Amino acid sequence: MKEGALMRVAIIGGGAAGLICACTLGEKGIDVTVFEKNDRVGKKLLSTGNGRCNMTNLGAMPEDYFDSAEFVAPAFQKYPPQSNIAFFEERGLYTRSDSEGRVYPLSNQASSVLDCLRLECERLSVRFSCSCDVKTVEKKGGSYVVNGKDAFDKVVFACGGRASVKDFNSYSLLAPFGHKATKTAPSLVRLVTDDKMTKQLKGIRAAVSMTLCSKGKKAATESGELLFSDFSLSGIVSMELSSFVSHLKLSGKNDFSVEVDFVPEMHFEKLLSILSDLAGRSGLKSENLLSGLMPKKIGICLLKKAGISPEIPMNTLLQNQLRDITALCKKCVFKITDVGPYSQAQVTVGGINRNDFFETTLESKKHKGLYCCGEMLDVDGKCGGYNLQWAFSSGRLCGESIIRESRK
């Protein structure tokens, strides 16, 4: 009989964390059943990274997880990004990374990652119970009973969070065990604004530097692509800052705005000098003044915001008008009224209180044999592979912890 064959483990949730935990356990011969609410496992995994699956980030560190650095450190020490990459390569899935350290499957398809995990589970005789909405998990004697009928020695809660999930209620499963969820909010999602300029620029993208302010005080700065849409700011730079907005809102902060620098490569005086030179040498319409620096439509909107008609000749612009234009190029302010809804978010801020779990094993401090991993815990990271890195590392740590228990 294989090592650990007598131990039965239930994993509630067939996402990234649950599946890699199942693989880790199955490899040691442990009897594993994955319960999944959807008709198949890994549905959310298919949508990550715009369908390409940003699996991890080469530069991921515990400090990239807001106030959770100390908690996630043991999982990262045991299973850093390179370890998770090796896990997949050993099973035939090869990867590539970009200049930002983001790691993707070589196929550029999220389905390749899901197939790798699913097929490995099948090879290891992991059972899938799909279209199974787990309503109750109860402690009876030394066992955990799922939905009043199936008994297990250990249970792993890997249900994910509220982001992109309809009718999420999995936090309640842990309530009978004394585990409560913290306040939650959507993260890695668009920023909502009441500025009409966004509607005029719908679909326009620009490489910018963007600073988030709360009551006028700078809170965070990110650089990357900004995408305008109806009364919202999207793109990776906005999604990054949405995490800070959500964390700050949960801590009681409000009154948010963002300052967008459309020409981050140049300081104010250099940009003013360039614009002054361009304006002095051309009788073209002012609408063309900024077209060599940013998308033309953005330039026109900035002119109008400065109270300047795009129709007047450039060489009629006064120095104070050029200073106003330069100032808007370097700091265009948008009031932020909210972040997008859970249905559009990639990650949840908050979750089951991590302080009730041992960071070295992810086992409950309240009930032996109960574990929690992935997004279900109140851990969230930056945009760019950091949250899947946590899912994979925490799922593997849960599995390894249970394996150690099976040897006692």
Model-assigned labels for residue ranges:
Residues 39-41, 46-47, 55-59, 179-183, ...:
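An anion/pyrophosphate-binding glycine-rich loop and adjacent beta-alpha core
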Residues 8-34, 398-403:
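N-terminal Rossmann-like FAD-binding beta1-loop-alpha1 element of flavoenzymes
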Residues 130-142:
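A conserved short coil-to-beta-strand element within the FAD-binding core of flavoproteins
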Residues 26-50:
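Glycine-rich FAD pyrophosphate-binding loop
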Residues 50-97:
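Glycine-rich active-site loop/strand segments that organize a redox cofactor
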Residues 12, 35, 134, 150-163, ...:
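Short hydrophobic core segments
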Residues 154-197:
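Glycine-rich loop(s) and the adjacent beta-strand/alpha-helix scaffold that form part
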Residues 130, 300-380:
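A glycine-rich dinucleotide-binding beta-alpha-beta segment and adjacent secondary-structure elements
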